[in-house]
Amino acid sequence: MTSLKQQPPHLLRGIPLAVQNLKKAFGTREVLKDIDLHIPAGQFVAIVGRSGCGKSTLLRLLAGLDKPTEGQLLAGSAPLDDAREDTRLMFQEARLLPWKKVIDNVGLGLGGNWRPQALEALEAVGLAERANEWPAALSGGQKQRVALARALIHKPRLLLLDEPLGALDALTRIEMQQLIEKLWGQYGFTVLLVTHDVSEAVAIADRVILIEEGQIGLDLLVDLPRPRARGSHRLAALEAEVLNRVLAIPGSPPDPEPFSPLPTQLSWAN
């Protein structure tokens, strides 16, 4: 298995994504409507919107957990399904197996001499010294770091994040944001982050996409240097622009987004 530090340069590049005329309906309810989107290789994109707007459905389609009703999902010019081995997904829950030690959770499903790479992945997220502990001994933030290490060991070119920081306290959340941003800069994968937190979106993403009632309502480039100064006037202005647009959407209580049961075999961060 190739070490994270020894990846050939072409593997340090993210996957370019193209979403064309995408629709997703559950019965008579159309959740996504004619989504067209191009994401360059290595871009960090945050997807925001009210609950039930369709953002998590979009991520599930990109992850291959659901199939579009209409439209195409492409990795460059090839079907996105061809890039599943290069794709990893993280959820709000770390989904660690409590009967396996931390390092074994990172190497879950791998064969051969995977332990050095698992330890290297844990080192990348700052948890190498906890490798032989049980998940129950970890905090919520540490468990998410393990889930991130479990994704990194597979050298992903596309990382899909479905509100992985939503259950963390404010300080731990900022630390995890900074870690994800650092690793993204180091490894160059393409990132799509679904989040309810607009401040999080503008703080770490290159681009913020607002989903309104199943359509793209705003596509905002965050053209600010990194690392970004939290609380700066320019960052606050961008956050206000997105929030004002979100709050301008009629606030009738949305239906929860439908979803299909998870398949038995799933490449989340494992």
UniProtKB/Swiss-Prot annotation:
SMART domains: AAA
Chief place of localization: membrane
Positions contributing to ATP binding: G49, R50, S51, G52, C53, G54, K55, S56
Gene Ontology MF term list: ATP binding; ATP hydrolysis activity
UniProt xrefs under Pfam families: ABC_tran
E.C. number(s) listed in UniProt: 7.6.2.14
Record protein name field: Aliphatic sulfonates import ATP-binding protein SsuB 3
Record-linked InterPro entries: AAA+_ATPase, ABC_transporter-like_ATP-bd, ABC_transporter-like_CS, ABC_transporter_ATP-bind, P-loop_NTPase
Membrane is among the record's keywords: yes
Catalyzed reaction equations: ATP + H2O + aliphatic sulfonate-[sulfonate-binding protein]Side 1 = ADP + phosphate + aliphatic sulfonateSide 2 + [sulfonate-binding protein]Side 1
Native organism: Pseudomonas syringae pv. tomato (strain ATCC BAA-871 / DC3000)
Subunit composition and interactions: The complex is composed of two ATP-binding proteins (SsuB), two transmembrane proteins (SsuC) and a solute-binding protein (SsuA).
